């Protein structure tokens, strides 16, 4: 099993898709449970996208973050949805945000609060969704913290999973395993 997908991941690159002719509307959803220390870097990477600003909203779902963090986010061009649950879960936060923001979007993109995205991320995803056969996209996660042995092992594990369980499957025309 692992050998087949490992070898498949080494096959030639997937075909490049032509650029999209229209800009789809994105809701970038960032559930943030006590993520005060990392949320700003994630938000800034979203706001710095090379994509029309009127075609995406960055939605921070603040669950038990500090009032100071919420105040600093409120002055940015983001939609801040504050939630309070007795028992917090990511799915509860996402459902609350979807109810709060409405249906004015073509694509919902979910990021973890410690993710950062490259400046062309939305454009690349928009190009993928221009293909009518594409219904869902799983993007490549890379570790940004490599400063100790455990973090390095986590990064190696992440790359193995990206290669075998996602890229190998995709290059064989199969659905990739979801992560995140």
List each model region and its residues.
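N-terminal membrane-anchoring/stem segments of glycan-assembly enzymes
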Residues: 1-22, 73
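Short beta-strand-to-loop acidic/aromatic patch adjacent to the donor-nucleotide binding site
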Residues: 104-116
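Short, acidic, metal-binding catalytic loop of nucleotide-sugar glycosyltransferases
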Residues: 44-55
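Cell-envelope/extracellular polymer assembly enzymes that use nucleotide-activated donors
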Residues: 24-27, 57
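A structural helix-start
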Residues: 32-40, 62, 66
């Amino acid at each position: 099993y692992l050998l087949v997908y490992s070898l498949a991941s080494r096959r030639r690159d997937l075909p490049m898709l032509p650029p999209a002719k229209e800009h789809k509307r994105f809701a970038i959803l960032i559930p943030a449970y006590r993520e005060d220390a990392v949320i700003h870097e994630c938000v800034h990477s979203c706001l710095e996208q090379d994509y029309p600003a009127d075609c995406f909203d960055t939605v921070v779902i603040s669950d038990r973050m500090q009032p100071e963090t919420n105040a600093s986010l409120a002055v940015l061009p983001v939609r801040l949805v504050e939630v309070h649950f007795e028992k917090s879960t990511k799915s509860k936060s996402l459902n609350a945000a979807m109810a709060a923001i409405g249906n004015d979007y073509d694509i919902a993109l979910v990021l973890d609060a410690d993710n950062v995205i490259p400046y062309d991320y939305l454009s690349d995803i928009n190009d993928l969704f221009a293909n009518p056969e594409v219904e869902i996209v799983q993007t490549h996660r890379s570790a940004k913290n490599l400063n100790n042995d455990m973090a390095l092992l986590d990064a190696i594990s992440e790359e193995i999973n990206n290669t075998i369980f996602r890229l190998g499957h995709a290059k064989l025309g199969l659905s990739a395993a979801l992560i995140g």
